[in-house]
């Protein structure tokens, strides 16, 4: 669907273009997978709920692809804009009629005062480059991308990478938020790390950000600890692998709870040591303890770790069989974090993180996990 056709379609939706006020804040979404679509649904609902704050249209960048729909080949954007449903990535969930799928990423960027990033982390730099020269000077961003970029020399938040490559201030949203459950409006909480007075535009306050995301089923808490929010979503995956190892060994819930507690302490220590994070962010907020519990009770990291122990197969084989070759976040993060800690001479201070790495990559027997921690 062309941008011209999209504009024509959106103009027909209540003639909302005619009532546009420059004072209203325009919201754009970068990404349209299951989580991106769920976030777009929330933003669309809140754009309608707060007509005094937000422009009624929410444009979601959707990578154009052909799909089979009702017996014929169609563009995914056309199907979405006709049915208000992402039939490929979030089937069965209706989005508000004011959310539009837009295949032109620069058009989405140029429209947006608040740009919400919800896409796989490996595409962040590429998308930043595609958006150069089209963004509003006072626009801000919110990253819903879980994980961190780790090398031997440094740990970088994806919010920092977005800031460095676009010039936009970037906050972080993270929590115990399974996309399908959020889309089904099952109650959950989330945490947004966002600094007050961070934007050159005084309109983009923490209260504005909260108004954009808070729903009766999606409770938002704003904190000033941006790195703490981001790190919780990354490091909990390592702990989830450890929890899966415990379940694979059938050592029981008491043991798993102990491993989760030790893992949380290492998450807090890592945040304090390298980012000056606030300890309470991980022990009290959804981005920390709640996300850790959810991930350790289920999910891909836990599932693959259980299979790794029970089958004795290498993790890359388990990934191939259970994830169709996708890389397991917890295992990959464990390797990256270990190499970083080794370079910092801090390996001994993080025994659980180190044990997960050595079990997955160096052949340490899984039953040695408890001895190691």
Curated annotation (Swiss-Prot):
Subcellular location: Cytoplasm
Residues that bear Phosphoserine: 15
Entry GO terms, CC: cytoplasm; cytosol; nucleus
Main location: cytoplasm
Gene3D superfamilies named among the record's database cross-references: N-(1-d-carboxylethyl)-l-norvaline Dehydrogenase, domain 2, NAD(P)-binding Rossmann-like Domain
BP-aspect Gene Ontology terms: glycerol biosynthetic process; glycerol-3-phosphate catabolic process; glycerol-3-phosphate metabolic process
Residues annotated for substrate binding in this entry: 146, 300-301
Substrates-to-products reaction catalysed: sn-glycerol 3-phosphate + NAD(+) = dihydroxyacetone phosphate + NADH + H(+)
InterPro entries (alphabetical): 6-PGluconate_DH-like_C_sf, 6PGD_dom2, G3P_DH_NAD-dep, G3P_DH_NAD-dep_C, G3P_DH_NAD-dep_euk, G3P_DH_NAD-dep_N, NAD(P)-bd_dom_sf
This protein's UniProt keywords: Cytoplasm, NAD, Oxidoreductase, Phosphoprotein
Positions of NAD(+) binding: 31-36, 123, 146, 179, 300, 329
Gene Ontology terms, MF aspect: glycerol-3-phosphate dehydrogenase (NAD+) activity; NAD binding; protein homodimerization activity
Active-site feature positions: 236 (proton acceptor)
EC number: 1.1.1.8
NCBIfam families reported for this sequence: glycerol3P_DH (TIGR03376)
Assigned protein family: Belongs to the NAD-dependent glycerol-3-phosphate dehydrogenase family.
Name the record gives this protein: Glycerol-3-phosphate dehydrogenase [NAD(+)] 2
């Amino acid at each position: 669907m062309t941008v011209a056709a999209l504009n024509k379609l959106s103009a027909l939706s209540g003639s909302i273009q005619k009532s546009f006020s420059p004072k209203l804040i325009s919201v754009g979404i970068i990404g349209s997978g299951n989580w991106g679509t769920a976030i777009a649904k929330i933003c669309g609902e809140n754009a309608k709920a707060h007509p005094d704050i937000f422009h009624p249209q929410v444009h979601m960048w959707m990578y154009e692809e052909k799909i089979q729909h009702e017996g014929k080949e169609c563009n995914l954007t056309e199907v979405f804009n006709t049915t208000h449903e992402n039939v490929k990535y979030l089937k069965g969930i209706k989005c508000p009629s004011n959310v539009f799928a837009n295949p032109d990423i620069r058009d989405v960027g140029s429209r947006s005062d608040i740009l919400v990033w919800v896409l796989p982390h490996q595409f962040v730099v590429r998308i930043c480059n595609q958006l150069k020269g089209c963004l509003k000077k006072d626009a801000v961003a919110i990253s819903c991308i879980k994980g961190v970029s780790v090398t031997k020399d440094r740990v970088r938040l994806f919010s920092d990478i977005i800031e460095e490559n676009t010039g936009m201030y970037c906050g972080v949203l993270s929590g115990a938020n399974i996309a399908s459950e959020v889309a089904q409006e099952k109650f959950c909480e989330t945490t947004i790390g966002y600094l007050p007075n961070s934007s050159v535009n005084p309109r983009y306050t923490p209260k504005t950000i909260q108004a954009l995301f808070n729903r009766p089923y999606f409770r938002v808490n704003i904190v000033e600890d941006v790195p703490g929010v981001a790190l919780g979503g990354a490091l909990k995956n390592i702990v989830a692998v450890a929890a899966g190892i415990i379940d694979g060994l059938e050592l029981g819930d008491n043991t798993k709870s102990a491993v989760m507690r030790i893992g949380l302490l290492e998450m807090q220590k890592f945040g304090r040591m390298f980012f000056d994070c606030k300890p309470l962010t991980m022990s009290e907020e959804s981005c920390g303890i709640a996300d850790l519990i959810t991930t350790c009770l289920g999910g891909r990291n836990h599932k693959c770790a259980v299979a790794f122990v029970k089958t004795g197969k290498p993790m890359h084989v388990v990934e191939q069989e259970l994830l169709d070759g996708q890389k397991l976040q917890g295992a990959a993060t464990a390797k990256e974090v270990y190499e970083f800690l080794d370079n910092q001479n801090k390996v001994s201070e993080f025994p659980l993180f180190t044990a997960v790495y050595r079990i997955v990559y160096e052949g340490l027997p899984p039953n040695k996990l408890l001895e190691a921690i």
